From Swiss-Prot:
GO terms for biological process: intracellular signal transduction; peptidyl-serine phosphorylation; peptidyl-threonine phosphorylation; positive regulation of regulated secretory pathway; protein autophosphorylation; protein phosphorylation. A lipid is attached at residue 2 (N-myristoyl glycine). This is Calcium-dependent protein kinase 1. Changing residue 27 to A: Severe loss of ATP binding. Partial loss of catalytic activity. Its EC number is 2.7.11.1. It comes from Plasmodium falciparum (isolate 3D7). Pfam families: EF-hand_7, Pkinase. SMART domains: EFh, S_TKc. Residues 346-364 are annotated as: J domain. The junction domain (J domain) is composed of 2 motifs that maintain the kinase inactive. The N-terminal autoinhibitory motif acts as a pseudosubstrate inhibiting the catalytic domain while the C-terminal motif binds the EF-hand domains.
Length: 524
């Protein structure tokens, strides 16, 4: 069709061209009662005091990027392996900011890093990398995240050359779900590519993670983004013109889908300049020999995602709900009945009025549990999440009960399902946004025998007890929630019945009793 596809394949496999150019979770002030306290995983990510070597030791180097390297590290006390992104401050290209004043330049550098930290803190989705800790010293920033041992999707593409439609659809559904979630929260990634998609392990495509939010930005519907950022193979033509919106991510996903199905990119070339010239024209082809066995539904989705005019291009949500993606969707089946029943049962029985206990159980569930411990519940969450936006709404929870009814499960035979779901949302929706978030689901649905080991309860207690006095104080709680102060009324509500010795503080034994009480009705 007039394209040298063989050269595209060879060039794509040997190059990773980089096109270079360069929550606030609390409320300060007059909180009247504990209902005003917003609880979410981002509140646990704070800049840690001390040297990173006191908490982690290096195992090996995983890779390197524009601003630093990524290390596999192991915690000295506790919960397995983590990936640590080490960002060397001096590696930033200070010239690209056209700033001569060193202080202003340093502020700009720090702004980019803090932007990535702020974004990662705010995200809670099964297909988006999770941030645990942040360290900083004179030379480096350290971002501690989940470790996914399966490596990059890029490596899988090189090894497998291309994927069948079922595997490609499974990969794209997860990527699009993550992108849909980002866009719903007014975040555009701007650097979606196979190198920024990680696999849980090399033998499974069921759990992937979107990483590297260094180029991400918040957007509004009224304002167009203007920075020229991204990677040449995957960059959208409107980004080259410096006038674009969140749909630049959809274009990048379209390029990835094209590559997954045929093994080479739609816009190839010997160098960045060649590639960008082709992207600017937006012309690509489905070579007959390479695409003759690919379904029309798959090709149609690619066409919609690679629509040149971004105003006419489909959204991530529309792509996620396309016929081709839905054709290969993994739905809840009979083998999932036990996990689904246990999850809904645990949510039904959860008593979430104690804010301190809510915060503790969310910390344990989101930060201390392992991938293996979360695996079955993560799978159920994604299957319940029919629209793929990374959150469970009332309709999706009701559908969970309806599925159990179809399996003749007694939990599905409840007469007042809508009332039950309303109560679940009231108790489990910790941040009161009207949805059950991924970490809320995991934390409340998981077996309390897994959650409430003495080690994990101690770690949760230490999160609050920042001065290591053995007591949780009013001031420490205010600090965790990002408040300037806590009223006596709110503190008394938080203390509740936990403060057995009436010393106006909570010790470890009182904390443990409180945690078991809030979940006494959970199935174990």
């Amino acid at each position: 069709m007039g394209c040298s596809q063989s050269s595209n394949v060879k060039d794509f496999k040997t190059r990773r061209s980089k096109f270079t150019n360069g929550n606030n979770y609390g409320k300060s002030g007059n909180n009247k009662n504990s209902e005003d306290l917003a609880i979410n995983p981002g509140m646990y990510v704070r800049k840690k005091e001390g040297k990173i070597g006191e908490s982690y030791f290096k195992v090996r180097k995983l890779g390197s990027g524009a601003y630093g390297e990524v290390l596999l590290c192991r915690e000295k006390h506790g919960h397995g392996e983590k990936a640590i992104k080490v960002i060397k401050k001096s590696q930033f290209d200070k010239m690209k900011y056209s700033i001569t004043n060193k202080i202003e330049c340093d502020d700009k550098i720090h702004e980019e890093i803090y932007n990535e930290i702020s974004l990662l803190k705010s995200l809670d989705h099964p297909n988006i990398i999770k941030l645990f800790d942040v360290f900083e010293d004179k030379k480096y920033f350290y971002l501690v995240t989940e470790f996914y041992e399966g490596g990059e999707l890029f490596e899988q593409i090189i090894n497998r050359h291309k994927f069948d439609e079922c595997d490609a659809a499974n990969i794209m559904k997860q990527i699009l779900s993550g992108i849909c979630y980002l866009h719903k929260h007014n975040i555009v990634h701007r650097d979606i590519k196979p190198e920024n998609i990680l696999l849980e392990n090399k033998h499974s495509l069921l759990n992937i993670k979107i990483v590297d939010f260094g180029l991400s930005s918040f957007f509004s519907k009224d304002n167009k983004l203007r920075d020229r950022l991204g990677t040449a193979y995957y960059i959208a033509p409107e980004v080259l013109r410096k006038k674009y919106n969140e749909k630049c991510d959809v274009w990048s996903c379209g390029v990835i889908l094209y590559i997954l199905l045929c093994g080479y990119p739609p816009f190839g070339g010997q160098n960045d300049q060649d590639i960008i010239k082709k992207v600017e024209k937006g012309k690509y082809y489905f070579d007959f020999n390479d695409w003759k066995n690919i379904s029309e539904e798959a090709k149609e989705l690619i066409k919609l995602m690679l629509t040149y005019d971004y105003n006419k291009r489909i959204t991530a949500k529309e792509a996620l709900n396309s016929k081709w993606i839905k054709k290969y969707a993994n739905n809840i089946n009979k083998s999932d009945q036990k996990t689904l029943c246990g999850a809904l049962s645990n949510m039904r029985k959860f008593e979430g009025s104690q804010k301190l206990a809510q915060a503790a159980i969310l910390f344990i569930g989101s930060k201390l549990t392992t991938l293996e411990e979360r695996k079955e519940l993560t799978d159920i969450f994604k299957k319940l999440d029919k629209n793929g936006d990374g959150q469970l709404d009332k309709k999706e929870l009701i559908e969970g009960y309806n599925i159990l009814r179809s399996f003749k499960n007694e939990l599905g035979e409840l007469k007042n399902v809508e009332e039950e779901v309303d109560n679940i949302l009231k108790e489990v929706d910790f941040d009161k946004n009207g949805y059950i978030e991924y970490s809320e689901f995991i934390s409340v649905c998981m077996d309390k025998q897994i959650l409430f080991s003495e080690e994990r309860l101690r770690d949760a207690f230490n999160l609050f007890d920042t001065d290591k006095s053995g007591k949780i104080t009013k001031e420490e709680l205010a600090n965790l929630f990002g408040l300037t102060s806590i009223s006596e009324q709110m503190w008394n509500e938080v203390l509740g019945e936990a403060d057995k010795n009436k010393d106006n503080m909570i010790d470890f034994d009182e904390f443990v009793n409180m945690m078991h009480k809030i979940c006494d009705n959970k199935s174990s």
